[in-house]
C-alpha cells in the first residue's frame, strides 16, 4: 500500500511545484526574455490551461489503458517542458514550455486521484486526501524558498532544471515502483455497473460544485492576498511572506488533524463544519473593525478548506470504481476552469479584491450547505472496493 501512497503524493506534487518554484525568478526571467513581469504573469494562466487540456483526455485514457500509461508520459512531458523553458530565449517560447509543463502535470494529477480511488476505501481515502492536502500546502511555502536558495548561486534557468529533476524522480517512481491499479476490464455481468457510473449522477455533480467552489475560495484568496495584505492592510513584503507562511501552517495543522477527526465524526459533519467556517470567514471579513480581526478571518478560510476539501473529493470519487480516471478529470477540469472563470469575471466586472473574497466565501458556504443537506449519497456501488487489479 505504501508504494501507491508515495507514488500518488509524488504525482500530485508536480502541479504546485510547477506553479510556485519559478515565481522567485520572475523579474530576472522577464529581463532576460525582454518581457515585462506583467506579460510573464500570464504564465500562471497558461500553465493552468495546459492542465485543463490534459484533463480532457487523461482520465479517459487512464480508464481504458491504465494508470501507468498516463503517468509515465505525463512525467516525461513535464521533464521535457522544464528543459524547454530553461532554454527559451523569447517569452513566446517560454509560455509554450509552460503550457507543456501544465499538460504533463495535469496527466500526473488525474492519475494520482484515480490511484487513490482504486486502492483505498471511502474512509481511508478521505483521510489520505486530507493528508495530501496538508502536504500540498507546504509547497507554496517551501518552493519559493528553495528557488531563492538556488538563485543565490545559479541563474534562473536552474529553477527549471530543478523541476526537471523532480520530474525525473516521479518518472522513476512511475516506471519502477508504481504497479498498475486500473480495475480489470469488466466482464459482461459488470457492464450494467459500468454504465451506472454516470457523471450526471446528482450526488457526484453536487460534490463537483462543492469542490469547485472551495477551490475558487482558496485561489481567490491566494490571487488577491498581495492586494489585501500589502495594499489595503499596509503590510510590508516581509510581513506578507510571514503571514502567508503562517496561513500555510494553519492549513497543514487542520489537514493533518482531519484524519483523526474522521475517526470521531462523520464525513458529513466535517463538510458542514468546513462550510460554516467559510461563512464565518466571510462575515468576519465583511464586518471586520481591525486588521487583527481580518487576519483571524483569513485563518478561518484556511481551516475551512483543509477540513472539508479532502472529504468532499473522496465522496466525489466514491461512486466510480470503473471510471475513476474520468471522474478525476471531470473534477480537475471543473475546479481549474470554474475558479479561473470566477476570478476573471470578478476582475472584468470590477469587483474589488476584498468584495471578491467575501462574495465567493458567502456564495460557496450557502450553496454547499444546501447541497450537503439535500443531496444524499446513493446506494453504494456493488463490490465497491473489491476490484481485481492488473499485476
Swiss-Prot record:
InterPro entries referenced in this protein's UniProt entry, alphabetically: MFS (IPR011701), MFS_dom (IPR020846), MFS_Efflux_Transporters (IPR050189), MFS_trans_sf (IPR036259), Multidrug-R_MdtL (IPR023697)
Residue ranges annotated as Cytoplasmic topological domain: 1-3, 63-68, 114-130, 179-202, 266-268, 314-330, 377-391
Mode of membrane association: Multi-pass membrane protein
Single GO cellular component term: plasma membrane
Main location: membrane
Pfam families: MFS_1
Signal sequence range: none
Bilayer-spanning residue ranges: 4-24, 42-62, 69-89, 93-113, 131-151, 158-178, 203-222, 245-265, 269-289, 293-313, 331-351, 356-376
Molecular function GO terms recorded: transmembrane transporter activity
Keywords per UniProt: Cell inner membrane, Cell membrane, Membrane, Transmembrane, Transmembrane helix, Transport
Location in the cell: Cell inner membrane
Membrane topology, Periplasmic segments: 25-41, 90-92, 152-157, 223-244, 290-292, 352-355
Similarity comment: family membership: Belongs to the major facilitator superfamily. DHA1 family. MdtL (TC 2.A.1.2.22) subfamily.
Alphabetical list of NCBIfam families matching this protein: PRK10473.1
Protein name as it appears in the record: Multidrug resistance protein MdtL
Record organism: Shigella flexneri
Gene that encodes the chain: mdtL
Amino acid at each position: 500500500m505504501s508504494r501507491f501512497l508515495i507514488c500518488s503524493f509524488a504525482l500530485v506534487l508536480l502541479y504546485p511545484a510547477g506553479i510556485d518554484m519559478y515565481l522567485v525568478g520572475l523579474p530576472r526571467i522577464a529581463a532576460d526574455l525582454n518581457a515585462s513581469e506583467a506579460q510573464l504573469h500570464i504564465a500562471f494562466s497558461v500553465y493552468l490551461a495546459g492542465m485543463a487540456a490534459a484533463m480532457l483526455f487523461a482520465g479517459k485514457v487512464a480508464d481504458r489503458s491504465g494508470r501507468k500509461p498516463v503517468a509515465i508520459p505525463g512525467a516525461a512531458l513535464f521533464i521535457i517542458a522544464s528543459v524547454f523553458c530553461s532554454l527559451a530565449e523569447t517569452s513566446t517560447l517560454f509560455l509554450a514550455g509552460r503550457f507543456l509543463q501544465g499538460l504533463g502535470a495535469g496527466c500526473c494529477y488525474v492519475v494520482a486521484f484515480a490511484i487513490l480511488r482504486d486502492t483505498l476505501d471511502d474512509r481511508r481515502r478521505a483521510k489520505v486526501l486530507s493528508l495530501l492536502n496538508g502536504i500540498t500546502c507546504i509547497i507554496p511555502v517551501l518552493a519559493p524558498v528553495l528557488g531563492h536558495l538556488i538563485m543565490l548561486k545559479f541563474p534562473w534557468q536552474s529553477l527549471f532544471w530543478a523541476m526537471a529533476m523532480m520530474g525525473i524522480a516521479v518518472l522513476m517512481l512511475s516506471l519502477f515502483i508504481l504497479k498498475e491499479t486500473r480495475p480489470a476490464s469488466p466482464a459482461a455481468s459488470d457492464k450494467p455497473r459500468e454504465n451506472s457510473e454516470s457523471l450526471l449522477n446528482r450526488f457526484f455533480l453536487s460534490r463537483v460544485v462543492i469542490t469547485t467552489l472551495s477551490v475558487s475560495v482558496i485561489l481567490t484568496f491566494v490571487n488577491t492576498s498581495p492586494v489585501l495584505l500589502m495594499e489595503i492592510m499596509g503590510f510590508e513584503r516581509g510581513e506578507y511572506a510571514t503571514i502567508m507562511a503562517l496561513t500555510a501552517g494553519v492549513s497543514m495543522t487542520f489537514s493533518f488533524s482531519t484524519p483523526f477527526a474522521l475517526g470521531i465524526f462523520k464525513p458529513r459533519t466535517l463538510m458542514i463544519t468546513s462550510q460554516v467556517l467559510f461563512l464565518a470567514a466571510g462575515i468576519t471579513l465583511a464586518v471586520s473593525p481591525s486588521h487583527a480581526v481580518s487576519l483571524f478571518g483569513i485563518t478561518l478560510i484556511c481551516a475551512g478548506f483543509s477540513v472539508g476539501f479532502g472529504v468532499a473529493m473522496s465522496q466525489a470519487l466514491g461512486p466510480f470504481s470503473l471510471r475513476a480516471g474520468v471522474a478525476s478529470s471531470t473534477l480537475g477540469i471543473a475546479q481549474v476552469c470554474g475558479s479561473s472563470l470566477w476570478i476573471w469575471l470578478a476582475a472584468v466586472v470590477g469587483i474589488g479584491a476584498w468584495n471578491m473574497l467575501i462574495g465567493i466565501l458567502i456564495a460557496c458556504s450557502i450553496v454547499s450547505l444546501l447541497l450537503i443537506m439535500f443531496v444524499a449519497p446513493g446506494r453504494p456501488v456493488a463490490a465497491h472496493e473489491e476490484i481485481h487489479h492488473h499485476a
